[in-house]
Amino acid sequence: MTETQFGGDEYDVSVSVSEAAVERALDVRPADVAPASSLTFARNVFVPLTTACRYTCTYCTYYDVPGEASLLTPEEIREQCRVGADAGCTEALFTFGDQPDDRYTAIHEQLGEWGYDSIHEYLRAACEIALEAGLLPHANPGDQTRAQMATVADVNASMGVMLETTADVQAHGGPRAKSPEQRLHTIDVAGDLGVPFTTGILVGIGEDWRDRAESLLAIRALHERHDHVQEVIVQPVRPNARWQGEPPGAETMRRVVAMARAVLPAEVGVQVPPNLTDVRGLVDCGVDDLGGVSPVTKDHINPDYAWPALDELSAIADHAGVPLRERLPVYERFLPADGGTADDGWVSQRIWRAIEDGDRYEAVRAE
């Protein structure tokens, strides 16, 4: 059987994708998959810990160059979490650009003044603030080593990183090019550490159809190894201040979403961002999740594209003829069954205790 290998010794990860599986994925069309029986979403507050990033991807407006990057103070984190909790959110979404490199001297000096040796130590403190405010942390800090993820895993309900693509694309180019192998390594490490994980692909950054199929199959292979992927995002790249490329059309998105649904196991959700896609035109292609939507903060990664209001999500579900259900940032299958303890699930004692003690979490789980 012909196979393509992704990864390698440098990042201690290896993923095999068979040619037969690629061909099957490429044959999938929307008519080949069934619509989901419901749509889910999480109510979050988006907390951009820092805009420093060692990468300079040409489609990304999130990062700021050295000297201009921001770093939220503990007080700012606490206030944003308070506002989110007051608005009924259950999730604190923490993002920052991948490990800020040595060019960001001001960021590292500020962290040192606050008593933190690394951005991951600070992320841990931020997650503690969120838990104290009554929110469940979901951190997306980009590429991570095993040690970095282990630093914060027990204070996160779930974590994530976008694979984006297994291809080497020009949009990732430059002296600090993003490596697909590093992303695969991060997803693999999450499984090793037992972290419920969200990942996904970007559509429209220079990848082709084969790349899309291989990317989804690589995610499936890692999930089959660890059983830890809770959802896969299919996200189009939209024009912004740094990227003026043509966005993928409606038929492209329909086919990619259908491919994702056909490739991924049934227990893995297929998510599309409702501020970046025409969800009504995709719900018959297997979409079952709309991701985190915030009633109080903007999408800091895609600031030009506002999240829809929650009643708009209800209208989308009504149009599709399916119920809309709120969920926690960790999927129910990763939690202990009724009467169980943290030892019976994937989340840490700290996270499970927070979920058990939170009336808001209990109400969401009961939906």
Curated annotation (Swiss-Prot):
Tell me which domain of life the UniProt entry assigns to the organism this sequence originates from.
Archaea
Q: In which pathway does it act?
A: Cofactor biosynthesis; coenzyme F0 biosynthesis
Q: Which catalysed reactions does the entry list for this protein?
A: 5-amino-5-(4-hydroxybenzyl)-6-(D-ribitylimino)-5,6-dihydrouracil + S-adenosyl-L-methionine = 7,8-didemethyl-8-hydroxy-5-deazariboflavin + 5'-deoxyadenosine + L-methionine + NH4(+) + H(+)
Essential cofactor(s): [4Fe-4S] cluster
Q: Which SMART domains match?
A: Elp3 (SM00729)
Disulfide bonds, which pairs? none
Keyword field contains Magnesium: no
The record's EC number reads 4.3.1.32
According to the UniProt entry, its GO molecular function terms are: 4 iron, 4 sulfur cluster binding; 7,8-didemethyl-8-hydroxy-5-deazariboflavin synthase activity; iron ion binding; transferase activity, transferring alkyl or aryl (other than methyl) groups
Coiled-coil regions listed: none
Boundaries of every Radical SAM core domain copy: 39-275
Q: Which Pfam families match?
A: Radical_SAM (PF04055)
Residues binding [4Fe-4S] cluster are 53, 57, 60
EC top class, as a word: lyase
UniProt entry keywords in alphabetical sequence = 4Fe-4S, Iron, Iron-sulfur, Lyase, Metal-binding, S-adenosyl-L-methionine
* Cofactor note text: Binds 1 [4Fe-4S] cluster. The cluster is coordinated with 3 cysteines and an exchangeable S-adenosyl-L-methionine.
User: Which NCBIfam families does the protein's record reference?
Assistant: F420_cofG, PRK06245.1
The role this protein plays is: Catalyzes the radical-mediated synthesis of 7,8-didemethyl-8-hydroxy-5-deazariboflavin from 5-amino-5-(4-hydroxybenzyl)-6-(D-ribitylimino)-5,6-dihydrouracil.
Q: Which family does it belong to?
A: Belongs to the radical SAM superfamily. CofG family.
Quaternary structure (record): Consists of two subunits, CofG and CofH.
Q: What name does UniProt use for this protein?
A: 7,8-didemethyl-8-hydroxy-5-deazariboflavin synthase
Organism equals Halobacterium salinarum (strain ATCC 700922 / JCM 11081 / NRC-1) (Halobacterium halobium)
